[in-house]
Structure formats: C-alpha cells, structure tokens
Amino acid sequence: MDATKTTEYARALLSSRGGKAEAEAARRMQEATKAGKPDEAEDWRRIRLAISEMRGPRQG
C-alpha cells in the first residue's frame, strides 16, 4: 500500500472509530499476522503508525 492510501485509511479509521482507531488497526494487524498475511499485517502496522502520528503526543 502506498503512503497516500495508508494516510487515507488512517484518516477514515480515525474519523469512524475515534480513540479506538489505533486499537482497531492493531487488532487487524494481529489478525493478518495470524492468517499468514505478512504484507497485509505490514499495511496495518503503517496505518496504526499514521493514526498515532495524527493523534499527536499523549498527555498524561
């Protein structure tokens, strides 16, 4: 998946799932890994990273 698609998926997931978007991407990454789909798992890892970057630093 190219960078533009990754960003589009991340934005859409963040818009639809809000604060749960990163967890959703992580879940899908794990599912792809378990299903023996390393390329798909890598796509979800990148989407998760993009979501994290969009959300910015966590404040505690």
Placement of each model-derived feature along the sequence:
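N-terminal acidic leader/helix
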Residues: M1-K20
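Amphipathic, hydrophobic secondary-structure cores in small proteins
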Residues: L14-G56
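Acidic, Ser/Thr-rich low-complexity linear motifs
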Residues: Q59-G60
